[in-house]
Design a protein with these regions (language model features):
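Nucleotide-sugar donor-binding catalytic core of glycosyltransferases
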Residues: 1-21, 30-38, 55, 61, ...
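Glycine-/proline-rich flexible loop or hinge segments
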Residues: 20-25, 46-50
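Glycine-rich phosphate-binding "P-loop"
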Residues: 22-28, 74, 80, 126
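Short N-terminal targeting/anchoring amphipathic segment
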Residues: 40-58
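Helix C-cap/helix->beta junction micro-motif
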Residues: 46, 70-71
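Histidine-anchored nucleotide/phosphate-binding helix
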Residues: 63-68
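A short, histidine- and acid-enriched strand-loop-helix "catalytic/donor-clamping" loop
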Residues: 76-88
Length: 202
């Protein structure tokens, strides 16, 4: 197994400076081109039989088609909805344009599974959310003081905001982590934080 951390490569660039963010938003950055070139070099060097893509925002349809034409099976797991983008981190055109290139999609959502099968005619399996952390990290987490609140990690959309506000209305305290939640909810029982990644999620 060889890991190719495309998303982390992008984050390292994007969050390094405000200039990088501006360059990317103005479509003047070459970071995605660099990531895709490195992806092709990596695939060429290890010649895998399968590639599992997490979400796929950084990989272009052209790069995926190149891999597919080499006989490599492409599998996608997207923890967000590939048809509804609730924020800049939840999806982009690379995801929607690449849907039919994959040999298999894993999704957490029954409606998404149905749409992938019926509209795009692609093989799809349901894979609920799950986490597997190291014993070392588990032991660190055990030593932390327990916080008796609901915790939600992810970017907002109207449905998520409505559900979270409904919980807050009945007296449940909630910590929310993600981008732009201030534009969706405002409640005394809800505390909003910036996104967290990797081990910081725990």
């Amino acid at each position: 197994i060889k890991l190719f951390p495309a998303q982390l490569m992008f984050y390292d660039y994007y969050y390094a400076s405000s200039i990088n963010k501006i360059m990317f938003r103005l479509n003047l950055s070459k970071i995605l081109s660099k990531i895709n070139c490195l992806f092709i070099k990596t695939v060429t060097s290890i010649n895998p039989t399968h590639i599992l893509v997490f979400k796929g925002m950084e990989l272009s349809p052209k790069s995926l088609l190149w891999a597919k034409q080499r006989g490599i099976k492409l599998v996608n797991y997207n923890p967000d909805n590939p048809f509804v983008f609730s924020g800049k981190g939840s999806g982009n055109s690379n995801i929607t344009k690449s849907i039919e290139l994959y040999d298999l999609h894993f999704t957490y959502n029954l409606d998404t599974q149905k749409k992938l099968k019926e509209q795009h005619k692609v093989k799809t399996e349901l894979l609920p959310f799950a986490f597997d952390i190291s014993q070392e990290l588990f032991e660190v987490c055990q030593k932390e003081k327990e916080v008796l609140k609901v915790c939600f990690l992810g970017n907002p959309d109207k449905l998520r905001a409505s559900f979270i506000e409904a919980l807050a209305e009945i007296g449940i305290e909630i910590d929310v982590y993600g981008n732009d939640w201030n534009n969706y909810i405002n409640h005394d029982n809800i505390t909003i934080f910036s996104p967290v990644y990797g081990d910081d999620q725990w």
